[in-house]
Curated annotation (Swiss-Prot):
GO CC annotation: cytosol; mitochondrial outer membrane; mitochondrion; nucleus
GO BP of this protein: autophagy of mitochondrion; mitochondrial fusion; protein deubiquitination; protein K11-linked deubiquitination; protein K6-linked deubiquitination; proteolysis; regulation of protein stability
Protein's name according to its UniProt entry: Ubiquitin carboxyl-terminal hydrolase 30
Function summary: Deubiquitinating enzyme that acts as a key inhibitor of mitophagy by counteracting the action of parkin (PRKN).
Residue ranges with Polar residues bias: 346-355
Coiled-coil blocks: none
Species this chain originates from: Danio rerio
Localization (cell): Mitochondrion outer membrane
Principal subcellular localization: mitochondrion
Active site: C73, H432
Domain USP positions: 64-482
A single MF term (Gene Ontology): cysteine-type deubiquitinase activity
Mitochondrial intermembrane side: 1-31
Gene3D superfamilies on file: Cysteine proteinases
Length: 491
C-alpha cells in the first residue's frame, strides 16, 4: 500500500475543496456508482455461492463431518458411531415423539434427546443437499444441563461420554409422569386400558416376570447374570441380575506370538473366580455338630461372574503410572453371542433335547462352527449377557482376523454385525479419536446395513475398505443384532 507524506495529503484536500460544487457532486456520483456495482457483484456472489466460509455440500455416498470445537474429537467420533446403529436411532425417534406428546414436559427437559436425535438423523441421511460439516455445539449445551461440563482444550474419553449420554437419557426417561386430574376422563381411560393389557396370572414359575422397564430402555441396555456354587455340595445360589450399557473387556495373558481374539476377551470376562473363607449354608446344615480334628470343616464357594476389569487398553508401570497397551486383538465382522446367552434350567433341557436329535441325524464332523466354537449350546454354568437387546456395545481393543475362514451362522439366534469402530491414536495423556462406520443404507434397500465403510476424522470423510476396518486397532466396537435368520457369510 503506497504511503503519502503529510504535506502531499493536505495539498490534495485543499485542491478538492477549491473545486466547484458541480465537480464535487459529479465525483461523488461516480463513487456512488462504483460502490453500487461492487455491492451488486457481492450480492450476486452470495446468491450463487453462499457466504464466504468453509461451508460445503455433502458429497454423494458420504456422511457429514463434525466441526472440532476444541479437542472434541472424542464426541465427534462417538456421534459417528451412534449414527451407524439403526436400532438406536429408531428408539430415539420413538422416545422423542413420546416426549413431545407430553404437554407437561418443557423444551429444556427434552433438549438432550432432541439435540441428539437431530444430529444422528443428519449423520445418517442420504440427502445430498445437506451440509458437509455439522456443528455439535447444541449437544454440549444440552449436556451442561445434566451437570456435565467440557472445558476448552481438555482431553476427554469417548467411552465416558457414552455412559454420560446413556445415563442422561435414562434420567430423562425415568422422570415421573404428571398425575392425571380426576375429571380428565380421557387420560384415565387410557391408563386403565394400558394396565389391563399388562395384567396376567401365573400359578407358578422358576423366576418372577421381568418388569416392562427392561423392554423400554435404550437398545444398548443389557443384563449380566451371576450366581455362586459351593465346590463341595454344588449347591447354587439364586441367579443375580446386573444391568450394563457396555462391556469393558481386558486383554488376557496369551502365549507370546499367538494372536488375541475378541472371543478370548469375552471368555476371560466371564471366567469363574474362587472365593475362599465363605460359609456354605447347605454344608453347614449337613455337617451340623460334626467336627474333624476338633475343627469345623471349611466350605468353599465359587462365583461365576467376572467383575468388570480395567479395559481401555490400560495397564500400570512399575512406577505406578498408567500405560496404554498396544496388543492387537482380532475381531470379525460377524459375532455370534449364542454361547454367552444365559439359559434357565427348562431352556437348557429343551436345548439339549433338540441338540441330541440333531446329532442323531447329522455327522458330528459337519457341525457348524461360529466364532471358532460350537454356537448351538447355551452355557448355563457361567453368567452371560442375555442377548435380548437389539444392539450390543462391546468395549474392547482389537485387530481383525487375517484368516479366510467360512463360518456358518444359519443356526445362530443371537447374531450381531459390526457397524462402527472407534480408534484412538496416541498415549494415555493425549491423542486423537477417529471412526470407521458404515455408510447409511439405501432407504428402499432390503438390508439395514450398507457394505460401504467410511473413515471419519472430525470434518474429514473418505471411503474405506472392510479390510482396513478389520486391521485397525479398535478402542470401541459397535455391534448391531441382525434379524435375518439363515445367513451364511464368509469372513
Amino acid at each position: 500500500m503506497p504511503w503519502c507524506k503529510q504535506g502531499t495529503t493536505d495539498k490534495l484536500v485543499r485542491e478538492f475543496l477549491r473545486t466547484g460544487a458541480a465537480a464535487r457532486n459529479k465525483m461523488m456520483k461516480n463513487w456512488g456508482v462504483i460502490g453500487g456495482i461492487a455491492a451488486a457483484m457481492a450480492a450476486g456472489v452470495y446468491v450463487l455461492w453462499g457466504p464466504i466460509s468453509d461451508r460445503r455440500k455433502k458429497r454423494k455416498g458420504m456422511v457429514p463431518g463434525l466441526l472440532n470445537l476444541g479437542n472434541t474429537c472424542f464426541m465427534n467420533s462417538l456421534l459417528q458411531g451412534l449414527a451407524a446403529c439403526p436400532s438406536f436411532i429408531r428408539w430415539l425417534e420413538d422416545f422423542t415423539s413420546q416426549n413431545s406428546a407430553d404437554r407437561e414436559r418443557t423444551e429444556r427437559e427434552t433438549q438432550l434427546s432432541r439435540s441428539l436425535m437431530q444430529l444422528l438423523k443428519a449423520l445418517s441421511s442420504h440427502d445430498p443437499g445437506e451440509d458437509d460439516v455439522l456443528d455439535a455445539g447444541g449437544l454440549l449445551e444440552a449436556l451442561r444441563l445434566y451437570r456435565w461440563h467440557i472445558s476448552s482444550f481438555e482431553e476427554q474419553d469417548a467411552h465416558e461420554l457414552f455412559h454420560v449420554l446413556t445415563s442422561s437419557l435414562e434420567e430423562e426417561q425415568e422422570r415421573q409422569p404428571r398425575v392425571a386430574h380426576l375429571f380428565d376422563m380421557q387420560t384415565l381411560e387410557k391408563s386403565v386400558e394400558s394396565k389391563e393389557k399388562n395384567i396376567s396370572c401365573r400359578s407358578g414359575g422358576p423366576l418372577h416376570p421381568i418388569p416392562s422397564l427392561w423392554r423400554t430402555r435404550h437398545p444398548f441396555h443389557g443384563r449380566l447374570t451371576s450366581y455362586m456354587a459351593c465346590k463341595r455340595c454344588e449347591q447354587q445360589s439364586p441367579v443375580h441380575y446386573d444391568s450394563f450399557d457396555s462391556l469393558s473387556l481386558s486383554i488376557p495373558s496369551i502365549q507370546w506370538g499367538r494372536p488375541v481374539t475378541l472371543d478370548q476377551c469375552l471368555q476371560h470376562f466371564i471366567s469363574s473366580e474362587t472365593i475362599k473363607e465363605v460359609e456354605c449354608e447347605n454344608c453347614t446344615k449337613q455337617q451340623a455338630g460334626e467336627l474333624v480334628n476338633g475343627e469345623v470343616l471349611e466350605s468353599q464357594r465359587t462365583t461365576f461372574v467376572k467383575q468388570l476389569k480395567l479395559g481401555k487398553r490400560l495397564t500400570w508401570s512399575k512406577e505406578g503410572s498408567p500405560i496404554k497397551r498396544q496388543e492387537h486383538v482380532q475381531f470379525t465382522e460377524y459375532l455370534s453371542l449364542d454361547r454367552y446367552k444365559h439359559c434357565s434350567a427348562a431352556q437348557s433341557q429343551q436345548k439339549t433335547s433338540r441338540t441330541n436329535k440333531a446329532k442323531a441325524s447329522a455327522d458330528p464332523k459337519d457341525k457348524a462352527i461360529a466364532n471358532g466354537v460350537d454356537s448351538e449350546h447355551c452355557n448355563n454354568n457361567k453368567p452371560q449377557s442375555n442377548g435380548t437387546f437389539p444392539s450390543v456395545f462391546l468395549h474392547s481393543p482389537g485387530l481383525s482376523s487375517q484368516l479366510n475362514l467360512t463360518y456358518d451362522y444359519s443356526t445362530s439366534e443371537y447374531l450381531f454385525r459390526l457397524t462402527a469402530v472407534l480408534v484412538h491414536h496416541g498415549d494415555m495423556h493425549s491423542g486423537h479419536f477417529i471412526t470407521y462406520r458404515r455408510c447409511p443404507a439405501a432407504p428402499r434397500g432390503t438390508s439395514p446395513f450398507s457394505s460401504q465403510w467410511l473413515w471419519v476424522s472430525d470434518d474429514s470423510v473418505r471411503k474405506a475398505s472392510l479390510q482396513e476396518v478389520l486391521s485397525s486397532s479398535a478402542y470401541l466396537l459397535f455391534y448391531e443384532r441382525m434379524q435375518r435368520p439363515g445367513l451364511r457369510v464368509e469372513e
